[in-house]
Regions:
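Small-residue-enriched hydrophobic alpha-helices in membranes
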Residues: 1-34, 38-210
Length: 210
């Protein structure tokens, strides 16, 4: 089983947490790809681009992915499994939701079944409608504004902007997320999100002449 493959010989609470998270993320990602009825190569590639799987575990992960992608049914249970590991709206949960959005849009516009899937997962994770709309804006085909990426209004003052950016950069830093239980396999996804946050802040500061 995937659980035994990932689990260390003497699991500690943090290691057990990382195993549970990894298994649930693979299942949620596979079922996300199946949400609109068809799993495309683009969706599989999107998962592999954001999640680093060690060569020794590729076959095991592949078998579990193939099993999970047979049907989107049961995704709520995996979402609840992840949600129990963290406080509501935790940065790690936002990273996971961002990954699911990335998979959903990888083969074109986000479809209605995919949107329903994402909405349900977001609710289980504790995110409200405003949170969801902010994350959705990041994945629209026309691209988000730098303010949408940071989750602030365009009239925010310079001092508050800098404070908010520093908070985001700290909470979404891979080291912070790893300490909170995110497995190292997902560092690539975390780095991608952090790069977007920093790039958005750079754009705004240049626009404002800061």
């Amino acid at each position: 089983a995937v659980e035994s493959k990932f689990a260390p010989s003497r699991p500690d609470p943090q290691a057990t947490k990382r195993v549970a998270f990894t298994v649930a993320v693979i299942a949620l990602s596979a079922k996300m790809a199946k949400a609109d009825g068809i799993v495309t190569r683009d969706e599989i590639a999107a998962f592999r681009a954001r999640v680093h799987i060690p060569p020794s575990e590729v076959k095991q992960v592949g078998r579990f992915w193939d099993l999970a992608r047979q049907t989107p049914d049961g995704f709520e249970d995996y979402a609840k499994q992840v949600a129990r590991l963290f406080v509501p709206r935790a940065p790690v949960l936002e990273q996971l939701l961002d990954l699911l959005f990335h998979i959903a849009k990888s083969d074109g516009d986000i479809t209605s079944p995919e949107l329903s899937y994402l909405t349900t997962v977001a609710g289980i994770f504790g995110f409200d409608e405003a949170d969801f709309d902010r994350l959705l804006a990041l994945h629209q085909s026309n691209g988000p504004s730098p303010y949408e990426i940071l989750g602030v209004s365009s009239d925010i003052d310079d001092q508050a902007l800098r404070k908010h950016w520093k908070h985001l950069a700290r909470t979404h830093h891979p080291d912070t997320l790893t300490a909170d239980g995110m497995p190292e396999e997902f560092i690539a996804a975390a780095n991608n999100r952090l790069a977007k946050i920093n790039a958005a802040y750079d754009v705004i500061t240049r626009q404002r002449g800061l």
